[in-house]
From Swiss-Prot:
Database matches in InterPro entries: LACTB2-like_MBL-fold (IPR047921), LACTB2_WH (IPR041516), Metallo-B-lactamas (IPR001279), RibonucZ/Hydroxyglut_hydro (IPR036866), Sec-metab_biosynth-thioest (IPR050662), WH-like_DNA-bd_sf (IPR036388)
Enzyme Commission number(s) from the entry: 3.1.27.-
Record's function text: Endoribonuclease; cleaves preferentially 3' to purine-pyrimidine dinucleotide motifs in single-stranded RNA. The cleavage product contains a free 3' -OH group. Has no activity with double-stranded RNA or DNA. Required for normal mitochondrial function and cell viability.
Known outcome of mutating D164A: Loss of endoribonuclease activity
Bound cofactor: record note: Binds 2 Zn(2+) ions per subunit.
Protein name, entry field: Endoribonuclease LACTB2
Subunit and partners: Monomer.
Length: 288
């Protein structure tokens, strides 16, 4: 069990974590939001969920304690537990100008409305740099968890704000495994020292953690490929594969296992290692 996270905690000279006060099975102890910089105006990364007054009061406490204000808001991805608090922050925390709220666009691009439509996103792109006193953040497009996911490299600390690409404990969920694995490999190349994750405690052995995430998925992939190689003339439905590969997993978890397995199959199909037919009862087979 991870140590209990404080609601407001200074993690370094330029990073303060404010906990989203929204604990749950997917959010762990809550969404980590971060005030980044050293000056009278700092960047806020992520905003927690909507309608969580405890979070707003923790954020106000942090701004008072560190004698600072919000320069702009950067959202790592569209999920509600990261973008949902924008409206409440704009309403409850006074600013002399309208907050600038930044994120990467959805892919394929689509209109995104914040709350009741009073605020609009300013869209970033991979490689953009966001600066404030004491901090330089470089945008890293890391799709996979979602199609618009970004991590941010804090250059002064060689640290990564990983959003939901990497968590402080356990593993994450993803929409596209092919993209997700490529994103992990890109993050590994940075050779970061620290990861400030979207949920859970700070990760001090950044490279080892990323490598662990990659290995975890590779082991499962090898298991799937071995099964296809040993049965290269056979084709399988997803549930047939689940019953073989997850045979030691309780049956009530097979639906979740099916979701994960399907993402692995789609990745392997993209790579030309297996193929599927177009029947209603889709079957998968080794690509010789």
């Amino acid at each position: 069990m991870a140590a209990v996270l404080q609601r407001v905690e200074r993690l370094s000279n330029r990073v303060v974590r404010v906990l989203g006060c929204n604990p749950g099975p997917m959010t762990l102890q809550g969404t980590n939001t971060y005030l980044v910089g050293t000056g009278p105006r700092r960047i806020l990364i992520d905003t927690g969920e909507p309608a969580i007054p405890e979070y707003i009061s923790c954020l106000k406490q942090a701004l008072t304690e560190f004698n600072t204000a919000i320069q702009e808001i950067v959202v790592t991805h569209w999920h509600r537990d990261h973008s949902g608090g924008i409206g409440d922050i704009c309403k409850s925390i006074n600013n002399d100008t309208t907050y600038c709220i930044k994120k990467l666009p959805r892919n394929p691009q689509r209109e995104e409305i914040i709350g009741n439509g009073e605020q609009q996103y300013v869209y970033l792109k991979d490689g953009d740099v966001i600066k404030t006193e004491g901090a330089t953040l470089r945008v890293l497009y890391t799709p996979g968890h979602t199609d618009d996911h970004m991590a941010l490299l804090l250059e002064e600390e060689n640290a990564i704000f990983s959003g939901d690409c990497i968590l402080g404990e356990g593993t994450t969920v993803f929409e596209d495994l092919y993209d997700y694995m490529n994103s992990l490999k890109e993050l590994l190349k940075i050779k970061a020292d620290i990861i400030y994750p979207g949920h859970g405690p700070v990760i001090h052995n950044a490279e080892a953690k990323i490598q662990q995430y990659i290995s975890h998925r590779n082991i499962r992939e090898q298991q799937i490929l071995t099964l296809f190689r040993e049965n290269f003339e056979k084709s399988f439905t997803v549930m047939e594969l689940v019953k073989i590969i997850y045979k030691n997993t309780p049956e009530n978890l097979h639906e979740m296992a099916k979701h994960n397995l399907l993402l692995h199959l789609k990745k392997l199909e993209k790579e030309g290692k297996i193929f599927s037919n177009t029947d209603p009862d889709k079957k998968w087979k080794a690509h010789l």
